[in-house]
Amino acid sequence: MTTAQPQTGTPAWRLLLSYVRPHRTALFAGALLSLVTGATGLLLPLVARELIDDLAQDRAITGALLAMSGLVVANTALGALGSYVLRRTAESVVLGARRTLSSYLLRLRIAAVDRTEPGDLMARITSDTTLLREVTTDSLIGLGTGGLTLVATLVMMGVVDPVLLGVTLAVVLGAGTVLGLIVPRINRASRQAQDAVGVMGAALERILGALRTVKASGAEPREERVLHEAAEESWRQSVRAAKWSAAAGNTAGLAMQIAFITVLAVGGARVATGAIDVGTLVAFLLFVFYLMSPIQQVVGAITQYQTGRAALGRIQDALGLPAEPQARPVPLPSAGAPPASVSFREVRFRYADDLPYIHHGVSFEVPARGMTAFVGPSGAGKTTVFSLVERFYDPDSGEITLDGRSLGDWELSSLRASIGYVEQDAPVLSGSLRDNLLLGNPEGDEATLAAVLKTTRLDGLVERLPNGLETLVGHRGTKLSGGERQRVAIARALLRRPRLLLLDEATSQLDAVNEAALRDTVADVARTTTVLVVAHRLSTVTMADRIVVMDAGRVRAVGTHRELVTADPLYAELAATQFLATGG
């Protein structure tokens, strides 16, 4: 299915049209059916006038009754068909918007994600896109068909009696002035209501993401109050929006009641003077009744558009967040691909303009092949090195190269295809163990998978699990231990056959036996691959070919363990504790 491309800085209605455009044929068909439905409805008052005239003159009314019955049946059938076509099209518009937005959110730069609440972004995909359904049917089509039906009805009323039409228009224009004052308030209230839904989603995501900590801290009552306050704020804003929408709808209804009473009074006087006959008055009153439907449709379209405009604004805001360029998928490195070299030259970096610098002119060289360890106190900037290599962020100044080529010159997909990355917290996604292992290499064969499972000592775990590799690991891998999650993350990285392997505290939760085994695995991998390790255990650091000592965002020394113990006081102090600082 075709989906709209992200557009920013454009009016909300134009963004809506970009979602509607792929479905314009179906939309036109539904609108045409709605117009035909309206046209058949306009004939009913005229048939009713003929029926009354026939009764007044004692003529047979069979033909008029049959015609009226046929029109009613046809009107109902066409209306039902048109409604189905429009609703189906509206669902397709929602699908297109969700596909566009979800694809865009997956390409968001990490810096943009850092500044937003995940729960609010989820609300934009689930809640805000749902409102496009009503905007498409009630607003876009409702305004078109309702407006045309309104004009056609007024024309027919003018044909029946121009004087009564003037009376009706005076009342309708008065109501329109009142509506013009109400509509902007609906837009503001709707935006605030949807923002409140996003805040509530963010609050819920925050709590569920750390539910064990909340329970262990006995913080349920306080967090419950936070959730309730967010829900109540959403309720207050939604009630405010509903108040103005109800005011708009009832203003239209009141206007039509006033119009009916006024037409009845003026029309009665005209019948009394002989200006018109009773059949004409009845026909005009039927048109007044019929006028209520398109007027309410137009008013509903305007009020619904204000709600949809707020939703489109939130969707547009999300599509305006900084994102990575779209890139074609690229194959992973082949077995035996040459290892990568990495260099940092005077790199300065901070996570946001209002935050202090993490790196203050970091420089180092990592040759192809071998293992390089990064050590230093917490907050020294070690993990940030890996984030910059992956281009989750770009440095403020300086240059980072891979194989002598600036990272900015690499296509992102090609760059990341060369890298295997094991994060500090070793995230595991909901799904099966197999899905998680093959996340970075869906085409991995069974033989390679079995070999990596053995290398990372996961083969025993797979044998113990009830469904083996197909066992579901739970939300964020809650059915696995911390050490098992780390081994899954390492196996996942190895299955990508990386030219550069980044291990950030990759063995921090492993027992001594598993750590020793994986240490041997990493040493073996380092013979053919470039391995960068952030580690806090001395046993891991001492096996590195070179060690980069970082402190306060600077590289203070580079060398082997033996060299640094005597040459660098900070490293000597860290080594003496037998436990290097975690984090940073």
Swiss-Prot record:
Protein residues bound to ATP: 376-383
GO cellular component, one term: plasma membrane
GO terms under biological process: transmembrane transport
CDD domains hit by this protein: ABC_6TM_LmrA_like
Transmembrane segments: 27-47, 61-81, 140-160, 163-183, 246-266, 271-291
SUPFAM superfamilies found in the cross-reference section: ABC transporter transmembrane region (SSF90123), P-loop containing nucleoside triphosphate hydrolases (SSF52540)
InterPro entries: AAA+_ATPase, ABC1_TM_dom, ABC1_TM_sf, ABC_transporter-like_ATP-bd, ABC_transporter-like_CS, P-loop_NTPase, Type_1_exporter
Xref: Pfam families: ABC_membrane (PF00664), ABC_tran (PF00005)
Residues covered by the ABC transmembrane type-1 domain: 27-307
Keywords: ATP-binding, Cell membrane, Membrane, Nucleotide-binding, Transmembrane, Transmembrane helix, Transport
Domain (ABC transporter): residue spans on this chain: 342-577
Subcellular location: Cell membrane
Molecular function GO labels: ABC-type transporter activity; ATP binding; ATP hydrolysis activity; ATPase-coupled lipid transmembrane transporter activity
Membrane topology: Multi-pass membrane protein
Family: Belongs to the ABC transporter superfamily.
PANTHER family: ATP-BINDING CASSETTE SUB-FAMILY B MEMBER 10, MITOCHONDRIAL (PTHR43394:SF1), ATP-DEPENDENT PERMEASE MDL1, MITOCHONDRIAL (PTHR43394)
Protein name: Uncharacterized ABC transporter ATP-binding protein SCO0742
Source organism of this protein record: Streptomyces coelicolor (strain ATCC BAA-471 / A3(2) / M145)
Source organism phylogeny: Bacteria, Bacillati, Actinomycetota, Actinomycetes, Kitasatosporales
